[in-house]
Amino acid sequence: MGFFDFLKKSAEPAAPAAPAFPVTLAADAKGTVVAMENIPDEVFAQGILGKCCGIDPTEGKIYAPADGEITQAPDSGHALGIMTTAGVEVLIHVGVDTVEMKGDGFSPKVKEGDKVKKGDLLLEMDLDKIAAAAHPAVVITVVTNTDDFKDVEVVAS
């Protein structure tokens, strides 16, 4: 079972080469799962950007949750966008208000346009620096195109 399990398209794709559904996204960090409503940022907690959940990380590494392409990689290093090969748009947001750190404590390993495989190291973060800046380090994973799917379910395993 994966982090986001049972992503189901609201309509069956017409193209014969389309990936099979359900689609599973792996956890992008090691740690404890945080339910969407418990994420300490109202935009994410209310699902405004899409269905999401968090991980309270136990190590400073972020991994690709699926095969895909990096679509966003801001200089601040605190977030990444991925379009998976299955058509799932994923936003990985590291910490709350960490954009204020202006890249300090973040070491991206990918750039926009890079192809990634599930499990590839995407970025490293310094959890001590995030804590010293008084920001929650929760890693938030959002399916930004939630409305394209019949259901998005979080299954912790």
PLM regions and their residue ranges:
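Contiguous, well-folded functional domains in the mature portion of proteins
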Residues: G2-S157
